[in-house]
Design a protein with these regions (language model features):
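Beta-rich, aromatic/charged-enriched effector core domains that present basic-aromatic interfaces
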Residues: 1-73
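Gly/Thr-rich phosphate-binding loop signature of adenosyl cofactor/nucleotide-binding cores
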Residues: 72, 77-209
């Protein structure tokens, strides 16, 4: 943010005097809260043709195409981004760290797969968020929290993978020699939070950052 000037005043300091509102991002999800549902994206003909091929060629790989939910075209990703900005972003900060089995995405944008695949860029996302904020004023803990996740944590982890991926994949820092049991791959460990996270990854190929 210092380099880019995002959410900073003319004097160079953060707007409202704080770089981080992380302490305001840990609220418990109320039982009666209504969570906006992302619009369903229609599958393209390419997706429909590829799904049976994937099931055939990668049948031994984790996961399934049965719950495929991702957009595959830029215009559809922009629709999801706009929906997040208008319907979810204002409460993103409050419940950023909340996890609840009633909804695996909650108030997150779930745009990381599209960034990873190159369908959309962090710059484009931040630009759209800030444009909306100028007219509609997203709450600061949500605005700062979301920007921190996109240009901070997401880009930081991307840099780690780019620089150290081979080392991370091949080194055994803790000198472990036992194999993971099957339950760690199908979500039957008997620990509900862990099993929920594993099954989410298997079903959707996406995980909440707290998971």
């Amino acid at each position: 943010r210092k380099k880019s000037g995002i959410v900073r005043g003319a004097d160079g300091n953060p707007i409202r005097g704080k770089w981080s509102y992380d302490e305001d991002n840990r609220n418990k999800l109320p039982k009666d809260i209504s969570i906006p549902k992302f619009p369903k994206i229609n599958e393209t003909n390419h997706t429909k043709k590829l799904k049976p091929i994937v099931e055939k060629l990668f049948k031994d790989h984790p996961g399934s195409t049965e719950n495929f939910w991702l957009a595959t075209e830029f215009d559809d990703v922009v629709k999801l981004l706009n929906f997040f900005i208008k319907e979810k972003s204002n409460l993103f900060g409050d419940y950023e760290d909340a996890v609840n089995q009633k909804d695996n995405i909650l108030f997150h944008s779930a745009l990381s797969p599209y960034i990873n695949l190159g369908l959309i860029t962090p710059e484009f996302i931040i630009q759209k968020v800030l444009e909306f904020h100028k007219k509609n004023k997203i709450r600061m803990n949500s605005l700062e929290g979301y920007i921190r996740q996109v240009i901070g944590w997401r880009e930081f982890m991307r840099g780690i993978y780019q620089s150290y991926s081979e080392e991370m994949e091949t080194k055994n820092f803790f000198k472990q020699n036992r194999k993971m049991k099957k339950s760690w791959y199908d979500g039957t460990t008997g620990l509900p939070p862990l099993d929920y996270a594993i099954k989410n990854a298997l079903n959707y190929g996406w995980s909440h950052h707290i998971e």
